[in-house]
């Protein structure tokens, strides 16, 4: 008897999402905010969490959190907001909501792996469209794929992961118009917005009619709360009301909600951390640009890509050599053709970044 008899074969054929062991490492692999909660706030948060009624299901504090986020982002009139247990859950709920015979999801690649995984798990056809070699959207290929498949959802990460760039606004506007014409949805994924000079929310407010079929998704992970798992999505109130029907009723724990409310009440602390990260991003990029055999690409996120000169295995060798020096980065060189010879590095603290730069210099010597 097979113990896997009733487990879907396509699920058995998938590869599980893996998290690297970071014990004892300088952790620069997961685009986290590297700064812990300041000591002066730790006691305050502990006191606040100690008062939470953990014996009760989440109640009115979830609505308080939605209101706080709406104020924080400047939610447009006639728009609604829904919460997810991280953006991952929101992506899964979108796939579930659009699961109909023949429905499809489209996204540029390389991109966030959960777009494809969630679509496939819900039985949706997934359509990847490769980026150009310069990491820009291939507009003719996107237009052709959208015309052919009319996907229910088109994901556009702004900035993109792992390439860390913002795509051309004019191209995005034309794609939104094309998808909107047949009633599809464009999801602008702004996970890395705290480190970016741009947000599509400005376009939504400037021209709500042209962006009526746009959903905007963000997370508090990059804000500084990766361990709290809070994602949120903005859209027309009538649309969010429909999507919210499939959200599990208690998907946000009372402790997570309280942590998020606390963080938003001290938003200036996290905004300063984001500014410090952006400053470090510039400094580290400038240092990398001076290293022989290293190409560093522009970034509008809390990460950047470097391309190493050498044979097809150079990125793997450098990745392993850095790991031996207790520096953990992300080897993306085999993820997609356009990422050949590439490593992705999270911007850490000044000390962490200095350790990375010194280790890389030694490895390349």
For the regions a language model picked out, list residue spans one by one.
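PLP-dependent enzyme catalytic core of the Aspartate aminotransferase-like
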Residues: 324-325, 334-365
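Active-site pre-lysine segment of PLP-dependent enzymes
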Residues: 120, 137-149, 162-223
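N-terminal small-domain helix-loop-helix segment of the aminotransferase-like
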Residues: 2-88, 93
């Amino acid at each position: 008897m097979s113990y896997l008899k009733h487990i879907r074969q396509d699920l058995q054929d998938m590869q599980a999402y893996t998290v690297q062991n970071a014990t004892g490492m300088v952790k620069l692999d997961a685009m986290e905010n590297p700064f812990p909660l300041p000591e002066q706030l730790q006691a305050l948060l502990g006191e606040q969490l100690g008062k939470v009624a953990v014996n009760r299901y989440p109640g009115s504090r979830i609505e308080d959190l939605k209101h706080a986020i709406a104020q924080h982002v400047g939610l447009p009139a006639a728009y609604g907001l829904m919460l997810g247990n991280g953006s991952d859950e929101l992506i899964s709920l979108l796939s579930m909501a659009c699961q109909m015979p023949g429905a499809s999801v489209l996204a540029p690649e390389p991109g966030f792996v959960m777009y494809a995984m969630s679509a496939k798990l819900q039985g949706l056809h997934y359509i990847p469209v490769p980026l150009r070699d310069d990491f820009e959207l291939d507009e003719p290929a996107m237009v052709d794929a959208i015309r052919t498949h009319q996907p229910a959802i088109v994901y556009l990460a702004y900035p993109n992961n792992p390439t860390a760039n913002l795509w051309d606004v004019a191209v995005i506007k034309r794609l939104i118009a094309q998808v909107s014409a047949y009633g599809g949805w464009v999801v602008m994924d702004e996970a890395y917005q705290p480190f970016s000079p741009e947000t599509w929310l400005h376009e939504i407010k400037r021209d709500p009619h042209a962006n009526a079929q746009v959903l905007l998704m963000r997370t508090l992970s990059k804000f500084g709360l990766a361990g709290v798992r809070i994602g949120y999505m903005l859209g027309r109130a009538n649309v969010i009301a429909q999507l919210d029907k499939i959200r599990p009723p208690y998907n946000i724990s009372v402790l997570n909600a309280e942590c998020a409310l606390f963080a938003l009440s001290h938003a200036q602390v996290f905004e300063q951390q984001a500014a410090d990260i952006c400053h470090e991003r510039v400094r580290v990029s400038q240092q990398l640009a001076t290293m022989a055999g290293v190409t560093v690409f522009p970034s509008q996120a809390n990460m950047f890509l470097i391309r190493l000169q050498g044979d097809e295995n150079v990125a793997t060798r450098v990745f392993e050599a850095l790991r031996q020096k207790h520096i953990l980065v992300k080897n993306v060189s085999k993820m997609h053709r356009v990422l050949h010879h590439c490593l992705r590095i999270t911007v850490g603290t000044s000390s962490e970044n200095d350790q990375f730069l010194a280790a890389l210099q030694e490895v390349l010597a």
